[in-house]
A protein has these predicted regions:
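Short, structured patches in soluble enzyme cores that scaffold and shape functional sites
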Residues: 80, 129-130
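Conserved class I S-adenosyl-L-methionine
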Residues: 121-129
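Mid-sequence acidic-hydrophobic segments that form the walls
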Residues: 98, 102-106, 128
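Intrinsic disorder/low-complexity segments
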Residues: 105-121
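Non-catalytic substrate-recognition/targeting regions of SAM-dependent transferases
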Residues: 2-17, 24-90, 97-100
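Serine/threonine-rich low-complexity intrinsically disordered regions
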Residues: 38, 95, 113-117
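Single, functionally critical "micro-switch" positions that shape active/binding sites
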Residues: 19-20, 128
């Protein structure tokens, strides 16, 4: 299973993450410790988001408007928002794995399933996060 997400470092109220081929530095208020990587490593990020600087992306031109990654066996379409989010929260990966497993069980016939008028299998999942 491919995992295009990686937490590279965190500290000083920020996190350094890899989403596919792009490395991003974003705020993380819980990261109150010192980062393990050097400032030079953090400076290599393709883009960074800063709340102290008026909620601005720096280097946003280095990112495509949208791109896809796969993590926890699920493919996601990402894009930077004006408030520093990308459209997913990687800390939810355990839930995505669970959802993927349940959908697989429905599709394979291991769990009860419903079908639409055309006979297409319709797994039913309600993810109330966010």
């Amino acid at each position: 299973m491919t995992d295009d997400y990686e937490l590279l470092d965190s500290g000083d109220g920020r996190k350094l993450e890899r989403f596919g081929r792009y490395v991003l530095a974003r705020p993380c208020s819980q990261a109150m410790w010192r980062p393990a990587k050097s400032a030079a490593e953090w400076a290599k990020a393709d883009a960074s988001f800063d709340r102290e600087d008026g909620n601005n992306w720096h280097g946003r031109a280095n990112l495509p408007k949208e791109w896809q990654i796969e993590t926890a066996g699920v493919r996601f379409k990402l894009g930077g928002t004006d408030f520093g989010h990308l459209g997913i929260f990687p800390e939810q990966r355990a839930q995505w794995r669970w959802i993927r497993q349940r959908v697989g069980e429905v599709v394979s016939g291991q769990r009860p399933r419903s079908e639409d008028a055309a006979g297409t299998v319709l797994p039913r999942v309600l993810n109330l996060f966010a």
